[in-house]
Amino acid sequence: MSLKDRFDRFIDYFTEDEDSSLPYEKRDEPVFTSVNSSQEPALPMNQPSQSAGTKENNITRLHARQQELANQSQRATDKVIIDVRYPRKYEDATEIVDLLAGNESILIDFQYMTEVQARRCLDYLDGACHVLAGNLKKVASTMYLLTPVNVIVNVEDIRLPDEDQQGEFGFDMKRNRVR
């Protein structure tokens, strides 16, 4: 086997066949049926693959799950529980996502994580929030509120103490000093 043949096989492995994207065409092949064919309809031997259907099925299941979570919250108007979590490592983010998938609200405080770890964890939670159609709101410099789709968070324009100092200090203040 030459190098060219190996290379061609490698390319063929990763390319899509044009045939698979075309709709299924019925061919004039004989269909074998049993003696009791009047009771059961005959099925063709070759059936198209179900890969395109599974993607649409996953999307519809996601929408159904989101609606199910919204309906559950409307039925259960008892007490609302907000879990408070202090993650110390990145692996704690999966537990937080499990709580969100269970239709619970979580207040997350990243004070025990480094800034790099907290950013990485927050990116993971933000992605999970988009998948589960939740809400992620910053409520303090190191605290975030993660809520499911059925919880509405009304946050006024909060100015955090750290943001006030950084927002007011600028180059204009240096120029306006009186000596």
Swiss-Prot record:
- Report disulfide bridges, numbered on this chain: none
Q: Where is the composition biased (Polar residues)?
A: 33-55
User: Is Protein biosynthesis among the key words of this record?
Assistant: no
Provide the alphabetized UniProt keywords. Cell cycle, Cell division, Cytoplasm, Septation
Q: Where is region (Disordered) located?
A: 22-55
**What biological processes does GO assign it?**
division septum assembly; FtsZ-dependent cytokinesis
This protein's GO CC annotations: cytoplasm
Entry's localization field? Cytoplasm
> Which Pfam family name is an example for this entry?
SepF
Subunit structure of this chain's protein: Homodimer. Interacts with FtsZ.
Summarize the protein's role: Cell division protein that is part of the divisome complex and is recruited early to the Z-ring. Probably stimulates Z-ring formation, perhaps through the cross-linking of FtsZ protofilaments. Its function overlaps with FtsA.
Q: Which family does it belong to?
A: Belongs to the SepF family.
Name under which the protein is recorded? Cell division protein SepF
Q: Which gene encodes it?
A: sepF
